[in-house]
Amino acid sequence: MLTYPQIDPVALAVGPLKIHWYGLMYLIGIGGAWLLASRRMKRFDPTWTKERLSDLVFWVACGVILGGRLGYVLFYNLDEYIANPTLIFEVWKGGMSFHGGLLGVMLAVWWFGKRHGKSFFQLMDFIAPLVPIGLGAGRIGNFINSELWGKVSDVPWAMVFPNGGPLPRHPSQLYQFALEGVALFVILWLFTRKPRPTASVSGLFVLCYGIFRFVVEFVRVPDAQLGYLAWGWLTMGQVLCVPMVLAGIALMVWAYRRDAAQPKAA
């Protein structure tokens, strides 16, 4: 059994102002994505400037935060937030939904593309390899917050979490960091080393994320207010991942068939 590191959720406090690690992880994720995007920008569109990239990152970040929070409210804990709406604004306590964040990003990208003459999937393919940075940082934030831990386990790396009772548990946040953050980043980065059909990168992203998240949900404790939805193992996270996997497969098939059907230059 490993010892859970006692980390103060507050990274920095200046008087009444407190900066939480959870929020700081979002800033790290957004900043890291911007740095990598600035390196890939000219390959994506030689006419783009740092200002336009910053504009895109800003709106995507808004989509992540607003969509992620509203997604958690709608998918995971609607009754509590209806009873006490002010809790919606307490984001430093956690409570973000990836699936809601993805929908928020999709809306932001659609709107940005309409303004700047880029198709939805052109922009999504550009953004997708950057997203694992934020996902990985967010899972570290979950770990520091001692939330979203896994089921009781006797594996050698199990931990006793401050909010998880006296028994050791799977550090499922670290599993998600390794899969959604590290593995997904490597897969997408290798896949995009050469030109790919439009929408195929987006398809690979949602396919891999859906598979990784579905698998980790087997060892992650579901939200207490929801529990298991069916058969003693099906979680809301898994329900939301099924359409992602199907959409990812469909997108990749469509992208490659569409590319094959287009006339090639002589």
From Swiss-Prot:
It is a multi-pass membrane protein. One of its GO terms (biological process) is lipoprotein biosynthetic process. A 1,2-diacyl-sn-glycero-3-phospho-(1'-sn-glycerol) binds at R139. Keywords: Cell inner membrane, Cell membrane, Membrane, Transferase, Transmembrane, Transmembrane helix. GO terms for molecular function: phosphatidylglycerol-prolipoprotein diacylglyceryl transferase activity. Signal peptide: none annotated. InterPro entries: Lgt (IPR001640). The chain crosses the membrane at residues 17-37, 56-76, 92-112, 120-140, 171-191, 199-219, 233-253. It is found in: Cell inner membrane. Its EC number is 2.5.1.145. Pfam families: LGT. It is an enzyme of class 2 (transferase). NCBIfam families: lgt. Belongs to the Lgt family. HAMAP family: Lgt (MF_01147). This is Phosphatidylglycerol--prolipoprotein diacylglyceryl transferase. The gene is lgt.
